[in-house]
């Protein structure tokens, strides 16, 4: 037993039990769907089972009981820990990079054989468990070979190695029944613009994605392909800067129909956006596929990957998810306990509190939408006028619009009512009305 806790269950808002769900009731129906279907919560293998608590200024602080002397023993023990964790928390999905499951061998062939052994153990567990794979991905950023990029590397052998890793992980994701596959270009970008052939690297990145699409279709993988935007870190400037940048890139290279986005909260703040902003950009373009649920520290300039317990932020996020009628995949907790939180049980506390924060956010977002929709309709109501409809329907010209306003002495705009909106938000969150 790796986690010294009882099974966490829903007990409702009045429960005094800290390790009980107060708001996340997987069977409760909200806005036409069960909570479990709105969320599909997932535990991230890398932060939860791989992290040792290192940071740039200090060594490992986590002595996890699944860390063994032999790397294969560790790999198998991590699988045991995964399924125990999911059983005790009710988390029904997981996500992983290829190198999260097992160490890298001397050759790619050897690495794939090692990976296959761990995948077989996961498949055995899955036969008697409800735990499923949300999405898979390949680690194309940790190994020194990727120091200058993977798909955008100046070395075609590195490009080929990265392509081979993705090929294998598409196979594994399909084999495990994953709902999607994510590509994150942590090393796809530049540190020095003068040393960068930007046109060539853009072409390489597009060609890489074209081959991913071709292979996905050839093997009959029915999951959704997704790109995860991030503006920087580890690269100074990444090509997948934010949702708008990625969507433009996909449009330019005729890849738009093949990909959706996996939006991460902390990546949004690093790009100078709110989490809800990035969700909306993806949603309005029909490209909101999945969410990496976490939060950043606005006073720090790096990816802190904290657990998402801010109910304001979860409410605004769930507003966008409601408007999107859900997600293709789900909510992956790309978050890590703090370096000083050294007990395995801290991982449980973090996930339970975050799942509750999103469940409460969903309930509040339903109420908020009821209050805000009429305010939005009132704000734009003047476009229901004759001239407003002509503008919207493309039935007017600059000449007609000029003649319409040239003799007006005043044009008044209605009050924005932002202060009223802020009152409404607090009334919903704290008053439950």
UniProtKB/Swiss-Prot annotation:
Question: Which InterPro entries does its entry note?
Answer: Xyl_isomerase-like_sf, Xyl_isomerase-like_TIM-brl, Xylose_isom_bac, Xylose_isomerase
Species of the source = Fervidobacterium gondwanense
Gene name, please?
xylA
Q: Entry's PANTHER family?
A: PTHR48408, XYLOSE ISOMERASE
* Entry note: cofactor: Binds 2 magnesium ions per subunit.
* Annotated binding of Mg(2+) 2, by residue: 264, 267, 303, 305
Q: Quote the subunit structure annotation.
A: Homotetramer.
Q: Where is the active site?
A: 97, 100
Q: Tell me what this protein is called.
A: Xylose isomerase
User: What taxonomic lineage is listed for the species of origin?
Assistant: Bacteria, Thermotogati, Thermotogota, Thermotogae, Thermotogales
